[in-house]
From Swiss-Prot:
Cellular-component GO terms for this entry: plasma membrane-derived thylakoid membrane; proton-transporting ATP synthase complex
The name this protein goes by in its record: ATP synthase epsilon chain
One GO MF term: proton-transporting ATP synthase activity, rotational mechanism
Keywords recorded for this protein, A-Z: ATP synthesis, CF(1), Hydrogen ion transport, Ion transport, Membrane, Thylakoid, Transport
Membrane topology: Peripheral membrane protein
Length: 136
């Protein structure tokens, strides 16, 4: 048995194929999906989706938040943005992660606008997801 996984962003279909297993970054923690999983809808956090293909290899997709629906061995993930780990440049992702960390550290050392800090934390989470997806 297998699952049909679709990862859809507003501007493109990022992934559409059969897989053996999916691990989703839900807002309440990592969620493993295998064939026969109960139907559900869950919020997706910024993070890395991991999928195991029929050949046993694991691949990663960086997700930028959204929702996932599981129904009858179909997993549909609707996200704000997504990127296949194998299409991300490792050096660029690591550089962006370090820059986002530095920007957040600078803001946390200052008193001031919490909206700027929230944006910096979100940027850091997105950069971390991209960096982790390429490294997996």
């Amino acid at each position: 048995m297998s699952l049909t996984l679709r990862v859809l962003a507003p501007d493109k279909s990022v992934f559409d194929d059969t897989v053996e297993e999916v691990i989703l970054p839900s807002t309440t923690g990592l969620l493993g999906i295998l064939p026969g999983h109960i139907s559900m809808v869950t919020a997706i956090d910024i993070g890395v989706l991991k999928l195991r293909s029929s050949n046993g290899n694991w691949d990663s997709i960086a997700l930028m938040g959204g929702f996932a629906e599981v129904e009858s061995d179909d997993v549909t993930v609707l996200v704000n943005a997504a990127e296949l780990g194998k299409s991300i440049d490792k050096a660029t992702a690591e550089k962006e992660f370090e820059q986002a960390k530095a920007a957040l550290n600078k803001l946390e050392d200052q008193a001031g606008n919490s909206a700027d800090k929230l944006k910096a934390k979100e940027s850091l989470n997105k950069a971390r997801a991209r960096s982790q997806a390429v490294g997996e």
